[in-house]
From Swiss-Prot:
Catalytic activity: Exonucleolytic cleavage in the 3'- to 5'-direction to yield nucleoside 5'-phosphates
Designated name of the protein: Exoribonuclease 2
Record Gene3D superfamilies: 2.40.50.640, Nucleic acid-binding proteins
Gene name for this UniProt entry: rnb
Residue span(s) of domain RNB: 193-521
C-alpha cells in the first residue's frame, strides 16, 4: 500500500537532503564491500548492496549515514566514471553475453554485455579477449550496468595474447603503418648531398636488427685527436611535415619495443629498407663531423651536412666486442681497413667515456634482459645481456652526436626537441643534504647541488660508493626527465645540452630535429619547428610504451616462472623499493620484479618495520635490509591472473617469545 506513495518519496528525499554528503573515489575489495576515499586520511565503508551501484575508480558524491552504529557511504551521484573503455574477457552466463574486466580490483565484477553493431556475438567464445565500454551506469539513472563490446582482440587460448591485449589496453597499434607504393625523395632544391659513398662507414647493431639508422667513421690524427663522422638515416628526405605519413608518425611518437617484437613508427618498407643503412647500398643521410680531442673534449668545429653514403660493413655487437676484448672473433674477421676504423672508434669511445666519468655523469652498467621466443610465442630463454665494448662504442658516438645537435640547434634557433632534466625537486633539497652530508667527506651546499656542475659532482660521488643505498634513496628526490622545445640542461647526464637526432626511423622528435638541422645547413627558416605541446605528447607516448613493455614482461615472467614456487628455485634479488607493506626486488638472473610482503620476512607486526622514507626494513629496531641490498629469495606465489610475483627471503627471522630484543636467523 506504501508503494509509489508520493508523500513517502518526498519524506525520504527530505531526510536525504539533511544527511551529510562527501565527494570521493570508490575503492573496491575482493570481498564485495568497498570504501569511499575522500582524501589520504579519510575513508568511509560502503556495504556490498551499495557497491552494486558503482565500480572501482568511480568518482562520486555519497550520502554519509549511520547504520549499525557505523558511518557508511551510499553513492548517490556520479561525477566521473572510473571505468569507461576497458579490456575484458568474455563470460557466457546461461548462454548470455557477459564480460569480466581484466583488472586486479575488478576481477569479481561480471557485467551484462552486448556486441556493438557489426560485431557478430556468435564469434565471441568463453574467455575471449575483448575491448568493451560502459554504456549504462546505475548512478546515471540506468537499470544496472551494461557494457558494449567494441572489438575482439584475440581468442582465449591464443599465445599472442600478452602482446595484443597489452597494446589494446594502452590503445596502441599492433601493426606497422601502411606505406605507399612509390616513395620519392623530396629534398629542398637547394640542399646539396655530398657524395660520401667512398668513406668506409660501418654499422654496428644486433644480429637481427633491420632498421639500421646510424653508421660511424673515425680517424685518429697524428696528434692523437679523433675526427668523428656520424651518418644518420634520413626519413625526412621522403616525408614532408604536411604529409599524411608525418601525421601518423606524430600520433605514434616512437617505435614500440616489446619483449620479442616491435611495432615500427614508420612503414617497414621505409624503416627496414629505403632508410635502413644496409651494407653496400647507397642511402641518403644526415651527417655530422666533429673533432674530439685525445682527452675526450668535443671540439667547436661541428659541421652538419646532407650526404649520400654507403655502409662498407654491417657489424654485430657481440662479434665486435669479442674482437675488441680478446683480439679475435670466431664469427668475424675484419679487413685491415675496417679493423683500423673500429679500433679508432673504440679509442675515441674510451676517451669520451673517461671525460664523461670525470666531468659529467655515467650511468652504472646494468644488464638488458631479453626474451627469446619460439615461433609460437613461448619463452625459450631469458638472456641478461651486459653492455659490452661495442655497445659502449656506439653509445659514446650517439651521445657525442646529440651534444653536437643540441649546441647547433641552440645557437641557430634557440629551439628544437631537447631532452632535459632539472636535477632535484626544489622542495627536496633539504632532504638531499640531510641524507648525503653525514656521509660525504666535504659537505654539499644547497647552492652547489642546484647547479649542473654540483649535481654532477654529487652523482659522481654516489657512484663511487661501494653500495647503491644512497643512490637508490636519492632517486626519489630527483625530478623526472622531460622533452622540451626550448634548450635546457640535462642534469641526470651532467650535460649542458642534449638533443637527439640519431634515431629518426624510431623517434618522431628526431624527425623534427632533422628538419631543423637541414634548415641550419641551408641557412633557411625550418619547414617545421616544435610547438609547445610536442614535449608533453612525446612524454605521454613514452609513458604508454613503457607501461606496455612492462605489462608484456610481467605476463611473460608469470608464464615462465609458473613452476618456480613448487620447484623452490632460489634467486639472487636486489631490493629496489621499500614501502610500509614490504619490499620490491628484481631477480638478477632474469630481470623479473617481485614483491616481498613484510609478513613473509617476519609475521609479527610488533617487531618488523618497513620504512619507505628511510628505505630500510628493521626487526626489533635493528636494520636487516636496505635499498640496494642483494639477498636470496624463493617465489612463494606466481599469480597468472594478475601477472605478479610474490617472493620471500630464504633467510628466516624466528618469531621469538618476548624477552631480550635479539634476532634469530636461520636458513630456509
Amino acid at each position: 500500500m506504501f508503494q509509489d506513495n508520493p508523500l513517502l518519496a518526498q519524506l525520504k528525499q527530505q531526510i536525504q537532503e539533511t544527511l551529510p554528503k562527501k565527494e570521493g573515489t570508490i575503492k573496491a575489495t575482493e570481498k564485495g564491500f568497498g570504501f569511499l576515499e575522500v582524501d589520504s586520511k579519510t575513508s568511509f565503508f560502503i556495504p556490498p548492496p551499495y557497491m552494486k551501484k558503482c565500480v572501482h575508480g568511480d568518482k562520486v558524491i555519497a550520502i554519509i549515514r549511520t547504520e549499525k552504529e557505523r558511518e557508511v557511504a551510499e553513492p548517490e551521484e556520479l561525477i566521473e566514471q572510473g571505468l569507461t573503455r576497458f579490456i575484458a574477457r568474455v563470460k557466457l552466463f546461461k548462454g548470455r553475453l557477459n564480460v569480466v574486466p581484466d583488472h586486479p580490483q575488478l576481477k569479481k565484477l561480471q557485467l551484462k554485455a552486448k556486441a556493438k553493431k557489426g560485431l557478430n556475438p556468435e564469434t565471441l567464445k568463453e574467455g575471449d579477449w575483448v575491448v568493451a565500454h560502459i554504456v549504462q551506469h546505475p548512478l546515471k539513472g540506468d537499470n544496472g550496468f551494461l557494457a558494449q563490446i567494441s572489438e575482439k582482440i584475440t581468442d582465449a587460448d591464443d599465445k599472442i595474447a600478452p602482446w595484443w591485449v597489452t597494446l589494446a589496453q594502452n590503445d596502441l597499434p599492433n601493426s606497422e603503418p601502411e606505406g605507399i607504393d612509390d616513395w620519392q625523395i623530396k629534398d629542398d632544391a637547394d640542399l646539396e648531398r655530398v657524395d660520401m659513398t667512398h668513406v668506409p662507414f660501418v654499422t654496428i647493431d644486433g644480429e637481427s636488427t633491420k632498421d639500421m639508422d646510424d653508421a660511424l667513421y673515425a680517424k685518429k690524427k697524428e696528434n692523437g685527436d679523433f675526427e668523428l663522422t656520424i651518418a644518420i638515416a634520413d626519413p625526412t628526405a621522403y616525408i614532408s611535415p604536411d604529409d599524411a605519413m608525418d601525421k601518423v608518425a606524430r600520433e605514434r611518437g616512437f617505435t614500440i619495443y616489446l619483449p620479442g617484437r616491435n611495432i615500427p613508427m614508420l612503414p617497414r618498407d621505409l624503416a627496414d629498407n629505403l632508410c635502413s643503412l644496409i651494407e653496400n647500398e647507397v642511402r641518403p643521410a644526415l651527417c655530422c663531423t666533429v673533432t674530439v680531442s685525445k682527452d675526450g673534449v668535443i671540439g667547436d668545429d661541428i659541421n652538419f651536412f646532407a650526404a649520400n653514403i654507403k655502409s662498407h660493413a654491417r657489424l654485430a655487437y657481440d662479434h665486435v666486442s669479442d674482437w675488441l676484448e680478446t683480439g679475435a672473433s670466431e664469427k668475424w674477421q675484419p679487413s685491415e681497413e675496417i679493423a683500423a676504423i673500429v679500433s679508432d672508434l673504440h679509442q675515441f669511445a674510451q676517451a669520451r667515456s673517461a671525460w664523461r666519468s670525470a666531468n659529467a655523469v655515467v650511468f652504472p652498467d646494468r644488464p638488458d634482459y631479453r626474451f627469446e621466443l619460439s615461433e609460437d610465442n613461448d619463452v625459450v630463454a631469458i638472456h641478461a645481456d651486459m653492455r659490452r665494448s661495442a655497445n659502449k662504442l656506439v653509445e659514446e658516438s650517439m651521445i657525442s652526436a646529440n651534444i653536437c645537435a643540441g649546441r647547433v640547434l641552440k645557437e641557430s634557433f634557440n629551439q628544437g626537441v631537447f631532452n632535459c632534466h632539472s636535477g632535484f625537486k626544489a622542495e627536496k633539497l633539504t632532504d638531499v643534504l640531510e641524507l648525503v652530508n653525514p656521509e660525504a667527506e666535504t659537505p654539499f651546499t644547497e647552492e652547489q647541488i642546484v647547479s649542473l656542475e654540483g649535481f654532477a659532482t654529487l652523482r659522481r660521488w654516489l657512484g663511487s660508493l661501494d653500495n647503491s643505498y644512497y643512490d637508490n634513496r636519492i632517486r626519489k628526490f630527483q625530478a623526472y626527465s622531460e622533452i622540451s622545445n626550448e634548450p635546457a640542461p640535462h642534469y641526470a647526464m651532467g650535460l649542458d645540452i642534449y638533443a637527439t637526432w640519431t634515431s629518426p626511423i624510431r623517434k618522431y622528435g628526431d624527425m623534427i630535429n632533422h628538419r631543423m638541422l637541414k634548415a641550419h645547413i641551408l641557412r633557411k627558416t625550418p619547414t617545421q619547428t616544435p610547438d609547445e605541446t610536442i614535449g608533453d605528447e612525446l612524454a605521454l607516448h613514452r609513458r604508454h610504451h613503457g607501461m606496455a613493455e612492462r605489462n608484456v614482461g610481467d605476463w611473460l615472467y608469470a608464464r615462465t616462472l609458473a613452476n618456480a614456487p613448487v620447484e623452490e628455485t632460489r634467486f639472487q634479488a636486489e631490493i629496489f623499493d621499500i614501502n610500509r607493506a614490504g619490499m620490491r626486488v628484481r631477480l638478477l638472473e632474469n630481470g623479473a620484479a617481485a614483491f616481498i610482503p613484510g609478513s613473509l620476512i617476519l609475521n609479527n607486526k610488533e617487531r618488523i618495520e618497513c620504512n619507505g622514507d628511510m628505505g630500510t626494513v628493521s626487526i626489533d629496531k635493528e636494520m636487516v635490509y636496505k635499498l640496494g641490498d642483494v639477498l636470496e629469495v624463493v617465489l612463494s606465489e606466481v599469480n597468472q591472473e594478475n601477472r605478479n610475483l610474490v617472493a620471500k627471503p630464504t633467510q628466516v627471522f624466528a618469531d621469538l617469545p618476548s624477552g631480550p630484543e635479539t634476532t634469530n636467523e636461520t636458513e630456509a
